[in-house]
């Protein structure tokens, strides 16, 4: 194994929780990211990658002593503000030259970007957001410019912004200043430090063209003049990638709407003709990771000829497999760690229930062993960021019962220095453990699930927390919502039902056409039965709770298995699949047919749509329902919540409906997040009998109540 010290790149193959901010090459996200773009995406996602997971926590060993012991017992109520307020620190990113650290931190109660010199504790704010906050940041390769994405009111039309971190008082510049357009697929390159590539759909809202940005020109005030069309989308391209040496766009992922296949296309130069490298038919999963340094090979992930994704080295001309580098039988490759210059694979990760790694480089393995030695026990260590020379790392430690903690790892001296804790206020409280468990569905399929509870001495009320997507998954690790439920006296169960990602193509596609009345929902029902049979759950007090697809599953559970649930909480969940798909954003257009294949053809089969859409089964609902919705949600429109809430109200079925006019697909503003959770907590106490903190709406919350407004209008008429 090579021990040459070169810059290494971390390629994620799993869902990104925030807008993509990887420093070098964004291609590795394509296939999974596109599948998830076509979905409604989880409101709360797991770590972005086994190597880049931005979540952590711990008591470090062999470091200056610091007490992180909880000062309370599990009986004390953990305030909602502690669980759901803004983190004090998040998303550390080391500048390529290794001198500075950028991170997120509240400024006047809103998350903004700060910078400090590494080794110092003086923080300087460099952005001035006063509304929704910034949720991710990365460095340009010039080591002075910071890049971040921002939308308006949750509309998800993210623009790419840049700010000069070294110039005091510098104003952020919108690098993609097109009204109504969306920017994504950002790529930077160390050989071209003054340039950024970004895809924008300003020419055609359904197609993303690749633009090249002249950073110095943009920062000087000419953002439009700094943009040059680099590669126009010929149609069907849903993602772009580059060759590192030239920084030319030489990779494209093309979706064929007719058969839902995806094709990786490549070219030899910017002027060259595109040619097909490999096609993944519907039912197969795969993506390109990178070109190899030899110019004759590429790294791919593929399920073709196997059940789970394997990491392959393939011939660039024939796509013939030269080497199977890594694979497991029960789960996909989750992350790939590359040498940025040689493209040598230094490590890969897998995650069936817990994170595992396989190393191909002795130095990298030794570094992770050292981090495990210095960090806490029972924690998953990840690299959040690295300097270009790899001498300075920002690392995090993920465990199940405490807040994120970050440290700086000196790769030369093999020493670890505390950096910051994401939410220091959480250190004062005792959290519940999370256990990974196995549940066997009625047809014998094994499901991985995660159980969080404070009281294991007797059956307690159960909350089934359903992840979004549905083409996503839950992970082991600290989850504020699960901890909240456990602290209030409930057991919380999270299930990776069939159709979840990460477990191979058969597991994924066993969810096809199985929404609502099919086996995807049966898996959730079977999980509840398991918890009851195991003495975990009080079968008379079960709640189903979820966001996005999880919100749909809540509505489905309330309508199709009404005897099972005492109450339900639906956050931005669709109630009518046909109207959902008729109102998706235009840039999802190339993926609509793929969604029809996965969900079922609700366009052609009206009866099928009615069968799986909870809106048509409102009469079956027996239990109270709480609905939360963002008015600006571009994925699940407000109408999805309106129509079922109004129909339930008309029929006298108990329903509460809270609408936030300044939110989208979930709650970005802490005041709204805390507000809705406060209302949820009182709802759960009323119907399940758990504990609740007193509730006063936060001053900045914007909750409105459409059912009450409708009744007021009706009364006046």
Which residues fall in each region the model found?
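N-terminal chloroplast transit peptides
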Residues: 1-4, 8-21, 30-55
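N-terminal organelle-targeting presequences
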Residues: 58-79, 99
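Mature N-terminal segment immediately following signal peptide/propeptide cleavage
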Residues: 75-107
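Peripheral, non-catalytic segments that deliver or gate enzyme domains
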Residues: 84-90, 108-113, 121, 128-135, ...
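Structural cue for short, hydrophobic secondary-structure segments
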Residues: 465-468, 484, 494
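A fold-wide structural signal in alpha/beta-hydrolase
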Residues: 486-496, 656
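Active-site-proximal cap/loop segments of hydrolase catalytic domains
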Residues: 497-717
């Amino acid at each position: 194994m090579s021990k040459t010290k070169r810059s290494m790149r971390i390629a994620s193959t799993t869902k990104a929780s925030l807008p993509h901010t990887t420093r070098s090459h964004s291609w590795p996200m394509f296939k999974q990211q596109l599948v998830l773009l076509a979905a409604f995406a989880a409101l709360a996602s797991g770590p972005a990658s086994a190597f880049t997971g931005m979540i952590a926590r711990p008591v470090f060993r062999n470091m200056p002593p610091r007490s992180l012991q909880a000062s309370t017992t599990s009986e004390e109520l953990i305030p909602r503000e502690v669980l759901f307020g803004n983190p004090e620190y998040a998303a550390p990113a080391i500048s390529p030259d290794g001198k500075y650290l950028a991170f997120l931190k509240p400024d006047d109660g809103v998350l903004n970007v700060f910078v400090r010199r590494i080794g110092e504790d003086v923080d300087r704010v460099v952005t001035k957001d006063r509304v929704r906050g910034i949720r991710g940041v990365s460095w340009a390769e010039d080591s002075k410019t910071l890049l971040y994405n921002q939308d308006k009111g949750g509309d998800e039309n993210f623009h790419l912004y840049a700010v000069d971190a070294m110039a005091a008082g510098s104003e952020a510049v919108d690098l993609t200043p097109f009204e109504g357009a969306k920017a994504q697929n950002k790529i930077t390159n160390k050989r071209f430090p003054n340039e950024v590539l970004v895809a924008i759909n300003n020419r055609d809202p359904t197609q993303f063209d690749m633009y090249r940005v002249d950073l110095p020109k943009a920062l000087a005030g000419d953002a439009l003049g700094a943009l040059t069309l680099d590669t126009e989308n010929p149609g069907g391209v849903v993602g772009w990638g580059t060759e590192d040496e030239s920084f030319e766009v030489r990779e494209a992922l093309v979706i064929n709407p007719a058969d839902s296949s995806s094709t990786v296309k490549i070219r030899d130069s910017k002027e060259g003709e595109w040619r097909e490298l490999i096609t993944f038919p519907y039912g197969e999963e795969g993506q390109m990771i990178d070109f190899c340094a030899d110019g004759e090979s590429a790294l791919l992930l593929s399920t073709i000829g196997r059940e789970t994704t394997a990491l392959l080295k393939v011939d660039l001309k024939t796509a013939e497999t030269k080497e199977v580098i890594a694979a497991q039988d029960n789960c996909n490759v989750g992350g790939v760690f590359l040498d940025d210059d040689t493209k040598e694979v230094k490590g890969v990760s897998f995650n069936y229930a817990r994170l595992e790694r396989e190393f191909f480089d002795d130095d990298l393995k030794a570094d992770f062993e050292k981090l495990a030695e210095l960090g806490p026990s029972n924690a998953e260590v990840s690299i959040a960021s690295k300097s270009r020379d790899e001498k300075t790392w920002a690392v995090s430690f993920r465990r199940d019962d405490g807040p994120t903690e970050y440290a700086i790892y000196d790769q030369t001296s093999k020493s670890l220095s505390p950096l910051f804790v994401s939410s220091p206020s959480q250190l004062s409280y005792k959290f519940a453990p999370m256990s990974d468990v196995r549940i066997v569905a009625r047809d014998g399929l094994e499901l991985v699930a995660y159980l969080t509870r404070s009281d294991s001495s007797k059956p307690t009320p159960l909350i089934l927390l359903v992840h979004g997507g549905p083409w996503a998954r839950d992970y082991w690790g600290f989850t504020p919502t699960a901890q909240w439920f456990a602290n209030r006296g409930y057991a919380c169960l999270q299930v990776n039902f069939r159709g979840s990602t990460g477990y191979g193509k058969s597991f994924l596609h066993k969810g096809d056409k199985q929404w609502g009345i099919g086996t995807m929902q049966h898996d959730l029902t079977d999980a509840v039965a398991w918890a009851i049979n195991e003495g975990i759950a009080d079968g008379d007090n079960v709640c189903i709770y979820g966001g996005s697809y999880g919100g749909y599953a809540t509505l489905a559970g309330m309508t199709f298995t009404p005897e099972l649930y005492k109450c339900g909480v639906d956050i931005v969940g669709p109630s009518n699949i046909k109207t959902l798909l008729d109102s998706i954003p235009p840039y999802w257009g190339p993926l609509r047919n793929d969604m029809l294949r996965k969900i079922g053809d609700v366009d052609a089969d009206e009866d099928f749509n009615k069968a799986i859409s909870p809106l048509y089964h409102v009469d079956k609902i027996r239990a109270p329902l709480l609905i939360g919705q963002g008015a600006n949600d571009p994925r699940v429109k407000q109408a999805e919540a309106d129509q079922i809430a109004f129909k339930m109200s008309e029929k006298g079925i108990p329903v509460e409906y809270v609408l936030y006019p300044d939110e989208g697909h979930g709650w970005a503003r802490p005041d709204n997040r805390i507000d809705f959770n406060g209302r949820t907590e009182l709802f759960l106490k009323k119907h399940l009998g758990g504990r609740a903190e007193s509730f006063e709406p936060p001053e900045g919350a914007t909750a409105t109540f459409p059912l009450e407004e409708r009744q007021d209008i009706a009364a006046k008429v």
